[in-house]
Structure formats: C-alpha cells, structure tokens
C-alpha cells in the first residue's frame, strides 16, 4: 500500500511538472530528431507521461526501459519522416507553378477554339446543304413548270391540228373518190363538168332507146310472125366497141329486147317465104340503123372520155352486161334456123 501511494504521488508531481516542460517533437526536423539526446530529461519525462506511462515498473527495469526507448525512437523517426514527406507531397500537389498554369490555360483555350471552329464548320455545312436543297427544289420546280408548259403547248398544238384536220375532212365526189385539201378544190369543178356532160349523154341514150323500141315494134307489126333476134350487125358493132372500150346503155336495152323474142318464136310455126323476105329487109334496115347509132355512140363516148376519166371507169361494168348478152342472141338465131330447116 505504501508503494502504491508513493507511485501515485510521484505521478501527480510529474504530471504537474510535465505541463510546464513538455518536449515538443513537432517542432523538430528529421535531422534534429536524429540528433536528439536520448538521455534528455525532458524527453524522458515526455516518454513517461506518454507511451511509457503504462508500464508501472519502468523505473525498476532499466534494461527493459532502454530497449523500449530505442524501439520507440526508431518508430518515431520513421513516422516523422513519413509525415514530413506526406506534407511535402501535399504541398507540391496543391501548389501549381505559374508556367504550368499558363500551359494548362493555353490547352484549355485551344480546346475551346477547336470546338467553336468545329461548330462553325458544321453550321456552314448545314447552311450550304440547306441552300443546295433549296436550289435543287427550285430547279425541280422550274423543270416541272417547263414540262407542264411543254405539255400544255403540245395539247394546244394537238387541239389545233385536230381542228384543222376536222376542217380538212376528205370530201367524197360524185364518183366516190376521196379528195383532200386543194386537190379536192381543183378536182371538184372537173367532176361537176363531168356530171353535167354525163347528163346529156344519158338523155341521148334514153332517146335512142325509145326510138329503137318504136322501130322494133313497127317492124314486128309488119311481119305476120315474130322475127328471129338480130345477131350479125350488133355483133360487129360490139367488136368495134370492145376495141374502143366505149359503149352506151342503149345497146344493152336493144340486146335485152332481142333476147325476148326467141321464147315466143319457139311456140309458133316456122315463117313463110314472104315473111322471110320481109324479115331480111327489116334486118338490113336495123343493121344500118345500128351502125349509124354505134358511130354516134363512139363520137359521144370520145367526148365523154375527154371530159372525165372517172365516168369511163364507171361505164365498163354496164358494157360487160351487153357483152354477156350477145352470145345468147347468137344461140337464139341458130334455133329458129334449125326449126325452119326441119319444117321444109
């Protein structure tokens, strides 16, 4: 108990004295720490108050105390050195040199300028592209307008052409021939003249037919029996017509009338000698008349052919009828001759 009291009294005394005289390690550099005197009373008091105060028997065990003191100082130096090095690094990291600061500022400024230039270039490109698009749209619109105008002009020209073509419709002449433009205007008076010339020719042919029918009826009345059909003189006239290729409708009517009598002659008796003489005389008269008629018809046909070629193209089909009827007249002539011979 006495020992404990004495130790407690000592510690109380040392604590009072330590407050006054405390060894400050923070004020020392690493070199100063290395040169500290380990036997310094201040240091010892500090150690006793601090890290070595836990050991109660430190005064009695001197050897142990010395070992602990050495280890403490070694670790202390290491800690101090590390702390000092840490402080230096912190200061170096926090403090920036002006040169480095200027370089950093230059770098930052250059980066900003590059960004601004890039944005300017992008804006210029976008503007150029927008202008190109606008120009393309304008060109497309102009092309579309030109195309529409061209189409409108084409439609107008087509309408004009259609109107002009409708005005110039091919007119059919009296001969059913298509005529257009100025040709129709030039040929129309010719066709009119030809039509006018054909009318008197048709009238003449009708008059000739009437006269021929009257003469035939008179000749039939004179003869007591029906006369055989006329054959020889019309055949010669038909040969002349085929050579000239111009005949009238009058000969057709006369030939058709000549075809009818054979039917009646077949039912009657053969003619007598007096009737044969009268028949021969009538045939001579008829042949003379037919030749004169054919000569007149040829002159008329020449005039008609000089006036218009189109009428001459329409007349041949009528002539073909007369040409077909003539062989029938020949056969009709032969039949009564055979009957007469049999009758004799």
From Swiss-Prot:
<feature type="region of interest" description="Disordered">
    <location>
        <begin position="95"/>
        <end position="344"/>
    </location>
</feature>
<feature type="compositionally biased region" description="Basic and acidic residues">
    <location>
        <begin position="103"/>
        <end position="123"/>
    </location>
</feature>
<feature type="compositionally biased region" description="Acidic residues">
    <location>
        <begin position="135"/>
        <end position="155"/>
    </location>
</feature>
<feature type="compositionally biased region" description="Low complexity">
    <location>
        <begin position="191"/>
        <end position="200"/>
    </location>
</feature>
<feature type="compositionally biased region" description="Basic residues">
    <location>
        <begin position="265"/>
        <end position="276"/>
    </location>
</feature>
<feature type="compositionally biased region" description="Acidic residues">
    <location>
        <begin position="244"/>
        <end position="259"/>
    </location>
</feature>
<feature type="compositionally biased region" description="Acidic residues">
    <location>
        <begin position="281"/>
        <end position="314"/>
    </location>
</feature>
<feature type="compositionally biased region" description="Basic residues">
    <location>
        <begin position="331"/>
        <end position="344"/>
    </location>
</feature>
<protein>
    <recommendedName>
        <fullName>Uncharacterized protein L201</fullName>
    </recommendedName>
</protein>
């Amino acid at each position: 108990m006495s020992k404990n009291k004495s130790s407690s009294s000592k510690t109380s005394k040392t604590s009072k004295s330590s407050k006054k005289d405390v060894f400050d390690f923070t004020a020392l550099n690493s070199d100063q720490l290395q040169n500290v005197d380990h036997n310094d009373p201040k240091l010892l008091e500090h150690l006793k108050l601090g890290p070595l105060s836990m050991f109660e028997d430190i005064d009695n065990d001197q050897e142990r105390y010395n070992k602990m003191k050495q280890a403490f100082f070694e670790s202390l130096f290491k800690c101090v050195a590390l702390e000092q090095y840490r402080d230096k690094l912190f200061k170096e990291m926090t403090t920036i040199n002006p040169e480095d600061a200027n370089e950093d500022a230059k770098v930052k400024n250059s980066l900003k300028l590059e960004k601004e230039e890039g944005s300017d270039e992008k804006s210029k490109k976008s503007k150029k592209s927008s202008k190109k698009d606008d120009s393309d749209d304008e060109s497309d619109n102009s092309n579309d307008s030109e195309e529409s105008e061209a189409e409108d002009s084409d439609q107008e020209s087509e309408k004009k052409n259609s109107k002009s073509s409708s005005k110039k419709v091919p007119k059919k002449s009296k001969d059913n021939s298509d005529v257009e433009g100025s040709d129709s205007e030039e040929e129309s008076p010719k066709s009119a003249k030809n039509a006018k010339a054909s009318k008197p020719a048709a009238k003449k042919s009708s008059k000739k037919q009437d006269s021929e029918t009257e003469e035939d009826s008179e000749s039939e009345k004179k003869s007591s029996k029906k006369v055989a059909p006329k054959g020889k003189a019309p055949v010669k006239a038909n040969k002349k017509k085929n050579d000239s290729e111009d005949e009238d409708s009058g000969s057709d009517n006369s030939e058709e009338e000549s075809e009818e009598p054979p039917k009646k002659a077949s039912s009657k008796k053969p003619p007598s000698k007096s009737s044969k003489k009268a028949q021969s005389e009538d045939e001579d008269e008829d042949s003379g008349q037919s030749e004169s008629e054919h000569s007149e018809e040829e002159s008329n046909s020449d005039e008609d052919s000089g006036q218009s070629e189109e009428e001459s193209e329409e007349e041949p089909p009528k002539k073909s009828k007369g040409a077909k009827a003539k062989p029938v007249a020949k056969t009709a002539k032969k039949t009564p001759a055979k009957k007469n011979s049999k009758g004799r």
